[in-house]
Every structure is written in C-alpha cells, then in structure tokens.
C-alpha cells in the first residue's frame, strides 16, 4: 500500500535539495497532497496558535454551534445529510487587505498571533511555489506572478473546529471536494484524525503529525501545470467523542482578476495535441463564481464549462 508522503525540508538549502525536490515532484504528481516537517515555523509558535484557537472556540463558538439549526436538526435526522457540513468556522482575510482588525470577537493577542501566523504561512507558500517552479522547469517566481492580479494574490485562512458528532454516519465534517485555488497550507489537529484524500478509488487518511504543515494543490495549479499536477478530492469525517478536531487552512490563491492558463512552456513540451486543449484560459473570479455553486461536484465539468465559455467569446459574458 502506498505511504502518504511526509517531506522533511531541513536540508532544502544544502546537499539534500535534489532528493527533497524529487519527493515533492512525486507527491504533486501522484498525491496532490504532502506533509511538511522542519518547515521553519517554530514549534512553540504553532503551540501558541493552537492553544489560542482552542480557547477562542470554547469561549466564543462552542455554545453558538450547539444552538445552530444543524446541531439541533441532526438529532431528528434519519437519512444522510448531503447539503450541510458539521463544522464551526470563521474566515480571516490577509491579502490583498486584512480583515483581522474588524473581527470583534477575537481578543487583541489572538489577532496579533494570527497576523504573524499568516505572514509565516504566506512566506512558506511562496517558497513552495518556487520549489514547484524549479521542478517544472519554470523561471523562479513564475507561479507567484501567475497568481498576481492587479492587487497581487489572494490569501486567507479558514479556522475550523469539528465538534464531536452524535451521528457521524449521517453527516461529514466537510463533504468531498477539490479546492478551487492555488496552494493550501493546513495546520491540523495532531491528536484527532478525520482528513482523508481520494487516491486510486480509496479514501486514505492524512496522518495527524505534531507541528507538521499539510500541503495540498488546488484547481488553479492543475490548470497552470497543464495537468502535470492534480488537485485531489478530500473530505473530513466526523468523530463521535473526544474534544473535536481543530483545523487551520490557509489558502494562497490567485487575485480575483488574475488570468489563469497553462504555462506555455509546459504546453509546448506536451506532444499530445488533445491534451493541449484540456485546460481553458479564464479569469479566476469567473471560475470562483462557477465553483461556489458546484463545489462538492467533480472538477472536470467546471473546466469544461470554463472552456466552453471562453470559446463562445466576449458576447457570452456580456
């Protein structure tokens, strides 16, 4: 059975670089996911982020979740719930403009820590994008530039808690989907599992590891790499007991008006004429408008819809 890729970045700047790049390439081509250790973010800092996130949930969100329609309604449910997720979340925007100062129920120390956390994750995301460029034979900075709209990239963090669920067979913590954006960095619970990815028709656990950062690729990297790398379906299962699962996912995405298309250098290398036409050219915001309505469906029809829209020309979008 294939082993989930865990990549140690400790020697990325010395004689271990070639091996690490090879591991990243294999993970991007065959998994769409990997887990990073020795990524440069101090363990003590991650411990602080985790503690403050858990404290905030208990103080501000736990009781609120128990009072939701979903929480109360599940008690009477007899059939599988397919239109909602068993999660308690809030979202922080970082780029192009931060909304952290406007989050009234976050205390000042938590705001400060999350701003610092976001900057560290932003730097790590950009470092990873350049490692992908190196593997792809693209110039350094190509992927970062590809994500730039008129205001730069979009970067935000989804903070999630998955409370214990009384009927885990009837509802998912988060339904199966691929991520729409670019590269996603996840700081997840190291004690409670639940995140799974779909590989070769089987659901495989993403192992909880203390102080690790899970990385997965979004739809936009599949397009830009002309299918060499793939976004992968993943989901979160619910748990019946324990303290619940914490998840902090940071999404480094294209700017809303960024124009996304396969890198010409990667298309030129592809001798298969049919494959050259698989991925469309589109504005990221247009893709997101489509994605929001069909997030929990297969990605391929989204690509086909964007390609059809592009082929119809300007009149179709007027």
Curated annotation (Swiss-Prot):
EC number: 1.14.17.4
Amino acids binding Fe cation: 177, 179, 234
Residues annotated as domain Fe2OG dioxygenase: 153-254
Gene3D superfamilies: B-lactam Antibiotic, Isopenicillin N Synthase, Chain
Gene Ontology molecular function terms on file: 1-aminocyclopropane-1-carboxylate oxidase activity; L-ascorbic acid binding; metal ion binding
Coiled-coil features, chain-numbered ranges: none
Tissue-by-tissue expression: Fruit.
One of the GO BP terms on file: fruit ripening
Pathways per UniProt: Alkene biosynthesis; ethylene biosynthesis via S-adenosyl-L-methionine; ethylene from S-adenosyl-L-methionine: step 2/2
Keyword Magnesium: no
Top-level lineage group: Eukaryota
InterPro entries for the chain: DIOX_N, IPNS-like_FE2OG_OXY, IPNS-like_sf, Oxoglu/Fe-dep_dioxygenase_dom, Plant_2OG-oxidoreductases
Cofactor(s) listed: Fe cation
Catalytic activity reported: 1-aminocyclopropane-1-carboxylate + L-ascorbate + O2 = ethene + L-dehydroascorbate + hydrogen cyanide + CO2 + 2 H2O
Family assignment from sequence similarity: Belongs to the iron/ascorbate-dependent oxidoreductase family.
Protein name (Swiss-Prot/TrEMBL): 1-aminocyclopropane-1-carboxylate oxidase 1
Origin species: Cucumis melo
Name of the gene encoding the protein in the UniProt record: ACO1
